[in-house]
Amino acid sequence: MAVMDAEPATTGPAGLIARLREKLTGGSSEASLTRRLAGTIFVIRVISAGLAYFSQVLLARWMGTSDYGVYVYVWTWVLLLGSMMDFGISASAQKIIPEYRARGEHALLRGFLSGSRWLTFAVSALVSLGLAGLVKLLSPWIEPAEELPLYIGCMTLPAFVVANTQDGIARSHDWMQLGLMPQFIIRQALIIGITACAFLLGYHLGAVAAMIASAGAVWIAMTGQMVVLNRKLAGHIEPGPKAYDVSGWLAVSLPILLVESFYLLLSYTDVLVLQQFRPSDEVGVYFAVVKTLALVSFIHYAMSATTAHRFAEYNASGDKARLSAYVAHAINWTFWPSLAATIVLLALGKPLLWLFGPQFVVGYDIMFVAAIGLVVRSAIGPVERLLNMLGQQKICALAYALAFAMNLVLCIALVPHFGGHGAAAATSISLSFETVLLFWIVRQRLGLHVLAFGK
């Protein structure tokens, strides 16, 4: 069965529009389904980006650059740790659930759908208590303005982790809206609503108030997502006994956790190192630049979220030609939209940064440095998901570890002297290095060409 849809030989404006509509929504093949799901995810992420951008603009203007910088620093820790504390189960769900379904192991499937969430909640709650104790222990060396926001961040983590796990479960059933909307739209809307109410009521909107609003938004969104997910699962899977293969889950998840952890460390090292060497207001400017370019990474995220469980299915069926065509399709639909989005964002960079405040426009030239790495990385598409789903988690984790180590060394070397420019340069160089490594690994291990151009 062909993976790619045939293109009608229509010409003229009407024909071009028809072909574009067919490209995006037509057909019944896996490629068409992937485009529709990826389009859904991309729309959700774009709306989320708009809400997040709006909320960050409001917070930056209401809080000032210094308080905003503290909030950004603490929230970055929440994003980093919260995304690592699920053992990789949110990602491995896209491998485990399709395999259980294919093998008819319904008891194990039911056990995973409930047990994975209880497991991640219990462990993340214990780890959060330990982290709060660590903050208390290190309080003499922590800036006073950061201490209370860090405690609030610890309280946020369990809900954040469970939401990630539920996202993975929902995506494995192709319920993209349920997986993503609570985290990326409802949560952002709640943050805007809570902080706006506090501001209008005359409360001082500092880093503490912003973190309280963010924590409340995370818990509310996660709880609502849990209620809806449980109802959908009840109608999708027949009741019956549950079996729990925790060791088997962890055997799949922990190598993926290594990949995800090094990816996250690579993503957030620049902000965390910048906070150690530069003033909080400079961190705020750099974060505004990163937020402005976030649309580019959303395209990669959309394709990753829709293709991972397909990679696992096609590999299990043994159809390498089908897998190869699907991989090429995913790469093309990652790179070319990413390139177009980068060009548009760079063209509109100054007015977008000005929305945060006139003082944020100084970060415009940093955008060009940061954009290089994003475009280079998009040229190989979601190959990290391909490696994870095809049992190459360890070598993929090694590639990310090397890229993270390079990024950390470069950030420490460049940030003290060049600030945000140095952080952006370090990240772009590291992303380019990671791209070369992943391309070579897939070529050697899987024999697949994973570049948007050439053979």
Stretches with model-predicted labels:
Residues 160-183, 372-399:
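Membrane-interface junctions at transmembrane-helix termini in multi-pass inner-membrane proteins
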Residues 53-67, 199, 203, 261-295, ...:
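Helix-terminus/linker motif at the lipid-water interface of multi-pass membrane proteins
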Residues 87-102, 172, 289, 293-318, ...:
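Helix-loop junctions and terminal segments of transmembrane helices
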